[in-house]
A protein has these predicted regions:
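Short, charged, intrinsically disordered terminal tails
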Residues: 69-79
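Long, compositionally biased, intrinsically disordered segments
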Residues: 28, 61-64, 77-79
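N-terminal acidic leader/helix
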Residues: 1-30
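Short, charged early-sequence alpha-helical segments and their helix-coil boundaries
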Residues: 35-71
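Residue-level marker of intrinsically disordered, low-complexity segments enriched
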Residues: 6, 13, 44-45, 73
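Acidic, low-complexity cytosolic segments
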Residues: 16, 24, 59-60, 72
Length: 79
């Protein structure tokens, strides 16, 4: 799951720049997860929060939905 998390972070850096890691750490706390023990379910919940609360501010609702689907595909691909 670490690889998927890092891929999401890299993509988010393209949108929010240096704020991306802090935004993801906030979502980690929101789901009571730790990066060192991140599970698929944790990462799926993080992506859902990103879709609902973070991504729409820049991408709009439709863009947030598309980006969240991309992120979930990365989660699925990572094992």
């Amino acid at each position: 799951m670490q690889a998927a998390y890092e891929r999401i972070e890299a993509d988010m850096r393209g949108i929010w720049g240096d704020m991306a890691p802090a935004m993801l750490r906030k979502r980690l706390r929101d789901v009571h997860a730790d990066l060192s023990t991140l599970s698929r379910e944790d990462l799926q919940r993080i992506v859902e929060l990103l879709r609902q609360k973070t991504l729409p501010s820049i991408l709009g609702e439709d863009g947030a939905e598309v980006k969240a689907k991309q992120y979930l595909a990365w989660v699925d691909d990572s094992g």
